[in-house]
Regions:
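Short acidic-hydrophobic, aromatic-tinged amphipathic segments that line or gate anion-handling sites
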Residues: 50-52
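Short loop/helix-cap segments at secondary-structure boundaries that form the rim of catalytic
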Residues: 39-46, 60-62, 164-168
C-alpha cells in the first residue's frame, strides 16, 4: 500500500486524501471520532473503518505495516495522538488536516452509516447475490470494497435462494428480485447504491456509472465503453467458474475503469481551464 504524501508535521490535506479514495492502494481512513461526535453526524469518509481513538493502544497492531489516515472531529489531539501510537506500532500513519469537519465543509462525499447493512463483530458487512456474476454483481462489490467496507464479505448462491440466505445469515441481498438494492427504471443496482450512499456527485464515479449502466441494461449507446465492458465481463465469466475468484479478477477491471474515469475527468477540467 503506497503511503500518502504528508507534510513535515505528519498531517495530510483533505485534497490529498480525496484523490486517493477509491484507488486499490488508498491508505486506510480511520474514523477515530468520539461516540458523541459520530452520533451527531453518523456519516463517514468513504472507505473508512471506525475505531475509538482514545483506545488506540488496544487496536494499533491491526494496522502494522499498513498506510493509514486518521481523522477525528477537527484533526487535533485525538487523531494526532492516535496517529503517533500507530506509528509506534509500525503503521504509516498521518492525521487528516482539519479532520471530519473540514472534509464536510468542503462538500466532499460522506456515506451515511444508516444506509449500510449491519456489521458483524469484526466490523464487516455481509452481502448475498445470484451466482455467476457478469456486470452489476461485480461492479457493486467493487464499489462496496473501495468506498464502503474494504473487508466486506460476498456470498454467491442460487437465484432462488438469495432472499432466504439473506434472512438466515443476516446478509444484505442485492441485484436480485425482491431486494432493496436492485434495478429501478432504467437504472441498475450500481446506480441505486451510488445515490443512496452520496457518491453520485463525484464526476469520475458518474462517468463510470454510465458505462456500467449501459453494459448491464443492454444500452451500449449511452457510453462508448459499455460494449467493451460486456465483452470483458462475459469473457471473465467463461474463463473462471469460481465466483469468488471471478470477483477478485473483476476488481482489477473496475480499478482500471475508475482510474480511466478519474484521468478523463482531470483532462476535461484541464481543457476547460485552457479554453477559459
Amino acid at each position: 500500500m503506497t503511503p500518502i504524501q504528508a507534510s513535515s508535521d505528519q498531517l495530510v490535506s483533505i485534497d490529498a486524501l480525496r484523490r486517493r479514495i477509491g484507488a486499490p492502494d488508498c491508505p486506510v481512513p480511520i474514523d477515530a471520532r468520539t461516540a458523541e461526535d459520530f452520533a451527531a453526524d453518523p456519516r463517514f469518509i468513504p472507505g473508512s473503518v471506525r475505531r475509538p481513538g482514545l483506545d488506540v493502544r488496544a487496536w494499533a497492531s491491526e494496522f502494522t505495516g499498513k498506510s493509514t489516515v486518521v481523522y477525528c472531529q477537527r484533526g487535533l489531539k485525538i487523531s494526532q495522538g492516535a496517529a503517533a501510537y500507530l506509528r509506534l506500532a509500525g503503521a504509516q500513519a498521518v492525521a487528516l488536516e482539519g479532520g471530519f469537519e473540514s472534509w464536510r465543509e468542503a462538500g466532499l462525499a460522506l456515506v451515511p452509516e444508516a444506509a449500510i447493512g449491519s456489521r458483524d463483530d469484526q466490523g464487516r458487512t455481509h452481502w448475498v447475490t445470484r451466482a455467476r456474476p457478469k456486470v452489476d454483481r461485480i461492479a457493486c462489490p467493487w464499489l462496496i470494497r473501495r468506498f464502503i467496507d474494504r473487508d466486506a464479505v460476498f456470498l454467491f448462491v442460487q437465484a432462488s435462494e438469495v432472499l432466504a440466505v439473506a434472512e438466515r445469515f443476516g446478509a444484505t441481498p442485492f441485484d436480485t428480485e425482491g431486494a432493496v438494492w436492485n434495478h429501478a427504471g432504467e437504472n441498475c443496482t450500481f446506480d441505486a447504491m451510488l445515490e443512496a450512499w452520496g457518491l453520485d456527485a463525484d464526476p469520475a464515479i458518474a462517468r463510470l456509472a454510465r458505462v456500467v449502466r449501459g453494459a448491464d441494461t443492454g444500452r451500449p449507446d449511452i457510453a462508448a465503453e459499455a460494449a467493451g465492458l460486456v465483452a470483458l465481463s462475459r469473457g471473465l465469466s467463461a474463463l473462471i467458474d469460481d465466483d469468488l475468484r471471478q470477483l477478485e479478477q473483476g476488481m482489477v477491471i473496475y480499478d482500471a475503469l475508475y482510474a480511466w474515469a478519474c484521468n478523463a475527468e482531470a483532462l476535461s477540467a484541464a481543457n476547460l481551464g485552457a479554453a477559459a
